[in-house]
Amino acid sequence: MASKVSRDTLYEGVNGLLEASAKKKRGFLETVELQIGLKNYDPQKDKRFSGTVKLKHIPRPKMKVCILGDQQHCDEAKANNVDFMDAEALKKLNKNKKLVKKLAKSYDAFLASESLIKQIPRLLGPGLNKAGKFPALLSHQESMIGKIEEVKSTIKFQMKKVLCLSVAVGHVGMKSDELAQNVNLSINFLVSLLKKNWQNVRSLHVKSSMGPPQRLY
C-alpha cells in the first residue's frame, strides 16, 4: 500500500523539525513524536487496535530497562551494567501496590527470565500489567544486550478512547535520514492497523518535545 506522504513532504517536515530544534538548544535530548489524528472511527464501536513495530534506529536511547532474572541472567546483567532484580528482591516488595507502582515508574520496560515470568503475577500482583509494562521474555538463547536493543527499538500503537494518538519515533540527535526512515516505517505500520487504512487518517504531524508541530498529512 503506497504511502500518501511523499518523500519530499516527509523530508521537509523532518528537516524543519531538526532545524527548529538546532536553533533552540535545550538542556536535554528532545524526543520526536509522530502525532496522529483519526477520522471515520468510533472508539466505542470499532475494534480498538494495538500493535508493535521495530524501528530501524532506536527512538529513545535513554530508555531504562530492568532485568527480572534467574541467577544466570542476573550475573549477565551485572557483568553488562544492566539493572536487575532476582526473585528474592521481588518477593521483598511483598505485593505492596505502592512499591510495585514505584518499580513500574522507575523503568520504561522489563525483561524477565522464563522461570520468573510465570511467577510475576504471584510475586507482584497486577501492577506491572496495569502500567502496560508486563515483561517481555528473555531466553538463554538470546543475547541480553541484543534483546535490550530490540526493546528500545520497538514502539507501540494503542488506540484508546480518543481519536488522536502520539508515539515516540526518534530524537533530535538523529540524522534526517534516520528520523525519516523511522517516521516512514511508523506511518506505514499504523495505516496497516487501521480498518480503512488511509481513509481513517485525518492528520499526521511530527513534533519535538519543545518544538512546533510539522504537518505531514
From Swiss-Prot:
GO biological process, one term: cytoplasmic translation
Pfam family, one: Ribosomal_L1
S-S pairs: none
GO MF annotation terms: RNA binding; structural constituent of ribosome
Record key words, sorted: Ribonucleoprotein, Ribosomal protein
Annotated InterPro entries: eL8/uL1-like, Ribosomal_uL1, Ribosomal_uL1-like, Ribosomal_uL1/biogenesis, Ribosomal_uL1_3-a/b-sand
Gene Ontology CC terms, in alphabetical order: cytosolic large ribosomal subunit; cytosolic ribosome
Family: Belongs to the universal ribosomal protein uL1 family.
PANTHER family: RIBOSOMAL PROTEIN L7AE FAMILY MEMBER
Protein name, per record: Large ribosomal subunit protein uL1
Source species of the chain: Drosophila melanogaster (Fruit fly)
Gene, per the UniProt record: RpL10Ab
